[in-house]
Amino acid sequence: MERAQSDWNIEIKRRKIAKKFYKEYEIISILKQLSQGLFFLQKNKIAHRDIKPQNILIFPNNIYKIADMGEAKEIDKNKMQMATLRGSELFMSPLLYEGLKYNKKNIRHNPYKSDMFSLGLCFLYAICLNLKVLEYIREMTNMNNIKNILEKFLDTNKYSDKLIKIVYKMIDLDENKRFDFNELENELTQF
């Protein structure tokens, strides 16, 4: 069994204290690694359901892996849209968060696209080194508002438009417009 050096949340906090922003190639490397793992799960009809920086472990040589499969669930294709509420509130997709707010037990949603939203928020946190950005996004009701908020937090000189557009597609409020892991994998082949 491998032993992780840290988790991504701890690393992001270290970088925030040191004011050491991720370089684009680092973000892309991490994104590719995590996308491959989550694409594998999606291909095998498994949704993680609790993606957050604390559940992303860092191993030697900057290898990032998804961990804590305690909330993971095999998804029946016929019932894919109906799922119980799982996940960490700050990293929940809009549909799951709405269900939590209104105390709903089951929510109609695509669990892979909910995982994608959670992963997108992890990357926003890493890119901005600021958890506040996630709190602001939680209150947004349309993508234009999100883009306006992110302009205040993102240093667009550090990251290409291409990368920013990928992150936007990961956190699109409309799950029908949001990437799944197959689509993200295809997009990442262009980097």
Which residues fall in each region the model found?
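Activation segment signature within eukaryotic-like protein kinase domains
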Residues: 30-31
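Conserved short submotifs of the Hanks-type protein kinase catalytic core
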Residues: 2-7
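Conserved C-lobe activation region of Hanks-type protein kinase-like domains
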Residues: 99-117, 121-155
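A conserved short helix/loop substructure at the end of the activation segment
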Residues: 171-183
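Conserved C-terminal C-lobe helix
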Residues: 158-171
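Catalytic-loop of the protein kinase fold
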Residues: 42-59
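Conserved activation segment of eukaryotic-like protein kinases, specifically the C-terminal portion
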Residues: 82-100
